[in-house]
């Protein structure tokens, strides 16, 4: 996978291309606008979070290096965890791409700036406050990474993003569990990108791994919101925090066999057209 794949993929005005970079990382292309979400293109977690009890070892290398993204317009981060706001990846992007703007929850602004992003290139993301960007709209949506967390001003630490590209709507949840009010925010979304690795008491309180929605919850959410398609994510990179994707497929066929879905391999792309 290299930059030519992104740049040479031809789209009609009503098409959106999704390129999978691993974990929850995606590049989205619409017309000539390029949006990176949660790019994790290093082994920062392996180097800095590995312990005797929890062994973080990537199951596959990043399909592309951060240096290839000198053309990207916007970089969106959903929260501060290193596999979503990667210091190595973000610092490289800031150096090689002078035009990119970085968007992240306002409470983690100082963290993102510490990776080499200048203040004038940072855009605060606040829940439900629409960002009018070049060629698209971005609507930040609160995410419950097991729970909803806010700072002293009531601003959310964890966000997902609903992105409107022409007539196509895409929701990237970041790390998220179901909470009251989420369904209403996501009605009739064309593509739901949802973390499906689940959660458990032992992971949370013994291994300090904060969880996400289960496969069953993701499928119910898609049905309740009348989603066009589900893209499961956050299930494949680390053995200590993944699931067998066959579980998702089995649940889907049992619970809602008519639901469209796409399961990505790292480096794969898919074109969405309504």
Q: Model-found features: residue ranges?
A:
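Metallo-beta-lactamase
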Residues: 1-13, 104-167, 253-273
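Pre-active-site segment of Zn-dependent metallo-hydrolases
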Residues: 3-9, 33-77, 88-92, 148, ...
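Conserved beta-strand hairpin/beta-sheet module of binuclear metal-dependent hydrolase folds
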Residues: 11-65, 154-173, 191
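Divalent metal-coordination and catalytic microenvironments
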Residues: 28, 38, 79, 86, ...
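Conserved catalytic scaffold of divalent metal-dependent phosphoesterases
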Residues: 38-44, 128-130, 135-146, 189-201
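Active-site environment of divalent metal-dependent phosphoester hydrolases
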Residues: 44, 81-85, 109-111, 129-132, ...
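Active-site HxH/HxHxD metal-binding segment of metal-dependent hydrolases
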Residues: 45-49, 63-131
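Cap/insert and terminal regions of metallo-dependent hydrolase folds
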Residues: 101, 107, 179-266
């Amino acid at each position: 996978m290299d930059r030519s794949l992104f740049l040479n993929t031809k789209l009609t005005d009503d098409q959106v291309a999704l390129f999978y970079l691993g974990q929850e990382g995606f590049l989205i292309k619409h017309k000539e606008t390029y949006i990176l979400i949660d790019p994790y293109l290093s082994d920062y977690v392996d180097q800095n979070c590995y312990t005797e009890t929890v062994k973080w070892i990537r199951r596959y290398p990043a399909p592309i290096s951060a240096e290839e993204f000198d053309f990207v317009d916007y970089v969106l981060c959903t929260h501060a965890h290193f596999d979503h706001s990667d210091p190595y990846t973000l610092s490289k992007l800031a150096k090689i791409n002078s035009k990119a703007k970085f968007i992240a929850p306002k409470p983690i602004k100082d963290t993102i700036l510490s990776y080499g992003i200048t203040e004038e290139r940072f855009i605060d993301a606040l829940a439900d406050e629409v960002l009018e960007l070049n060629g698209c709209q971005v609507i930040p949506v609160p995410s419950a990474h097991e729970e909803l967390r806010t700072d002293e001003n009531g601003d959310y630490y964890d966000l997902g993003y609903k992105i409107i590209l022409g007539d196509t709507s895409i929701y990237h949840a970041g790390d998220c569990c179901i909470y009251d009010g989420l369904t209403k925010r996501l009605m009739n979304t064309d593509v739901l990108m949802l973390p499906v690795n689940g959660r458990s008491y032992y992971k949370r309180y013994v291994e300090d791994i904060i969880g996400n929605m289960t496969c069953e919850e993701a499928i119910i959410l898609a049905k309740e919101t009348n989603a066009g398609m589900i893209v499961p994510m956050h299930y494949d990179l680390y053995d200590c925090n993944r699931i067998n994707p066959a579980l998702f497929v089995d649940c889907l066929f049992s619970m809602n066999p008519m639901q469209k879905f796409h399961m990505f391999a790292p480096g794969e792309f898919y074109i969405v057209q309504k």
